[in-house]
């Protein structure tokens, strides 16, 4: 591993850490405090959480637009510059979320301000993942790309670990009333520290040579198409596969990490500190699983690992929820880790697979579009759908069947594309 690659990996990871710190923070706050603080009370605790989860989904709506804008300019002027801008916007909006007054103080302005900040933040998030993954992939050797390109994905458990640790420290040292009143806000304000560290790390990295060469070739062309038009015109099958392939991973992840918090609180009756402690342990294990699965994709190929993970997704609900229902901490931990292990089989190879499917001059646009469109139909709605099914049927079986449907979509999608392991990133440039 060269010094340059080390810097690039660190620079790509830090944005992902900031992104997932906020997302786990918001998902946890939705389940624990937002329903009570920012929405009119109906007397039913589930209704408030449903409203918070609906707003959780709103943040995903702006992501595809952000992906297109950041992707277009990232393909034209460079990955690094756009990654810096996205990180700054993420930091500002997350900090401001911690400043919003409650529904009791300003009425409907509270959820309105939350919606506005979620949309702006979602726009910035739209350009983060694609740029980070591409930055690493374009610096990586062809035969080890699965491993190195999976490292930005470890920002997911790392961000969640930091968020869980912050929330755990706050909930352990504050009374429930103090945590509800002001403690949760400190967690959002802490995001500024994460972002400042990220900006400092990213200032010393540069775009890869494969991008600079492709950029020079494109500048010689008399007429260039808008990136997304070229993506949709010449790469339809890859786009469909890229979007559909995320359903199993995306829905399973939000089921295991976000919805399970509500499930453990409402059905299993675990307290906040217990849930956060279990999540902390699971995220720590998840951090090591992700690069391992990326390494396996370098050995066996992207598709075999992906397909096994997609198939296993169909079975998690029938195993995971009964394990949680026991109320035993070790079995609950097993359910969460099992879900994250399966999710990693589809999440880890995705970055290398998608990078290898598209040519350099439209890669940022294509990756960001596929990655950000999928959650609108998948993960963004997963906690809301799961909680609604739980409310209507008072059973985890319908939720498990929902996971089966997601699994089938991803299996069909991944079968649409050819194996890409070992492919040069200059293959179409």
From Swiss-Prot:
Alphabetical list of PROSITE patterns matching this protein: MFS, SUGAR_TRANSPORT_2
Regulation: Inhibited by the efflux inhibitor and energy decoupler carbonyl cyanide m-chlorophenylhydrazone (CCCP).
Induction and repression of expression: Expression is up-regulated on exposure to fosfomycin.
Subcellular location: Cell inner membrane
Keywords per UniProt: Antibiotic resistance, Cell inner membrane, Cell membrane, Membrane, Transmembrane, Transmembrane helix, Transport
Membrane-related topology note: Multi-pass membrane protein
Principal localisation: membrane
PANTHER family, per the entry: SHIKIMATE TRANSPORTER
Family statement drawn from the similarity comment of this UniProt entry: Belongs to the major facilitator superfamily.
Role: Efflux pump that mediates resistance to fosfomycin. Probably also involved in the secretion of biofilm matrix that contributes to the pathogenicity.
Protein name, entry field: Fosfomycin resistance protein AbaF
Native organism: Acinetobacter baumannii (strain ATCC 17978 / DSM 105126 / CIP 53.77 / LMG 1025 / NCDC KC755 / 5377)
Gene: abaF
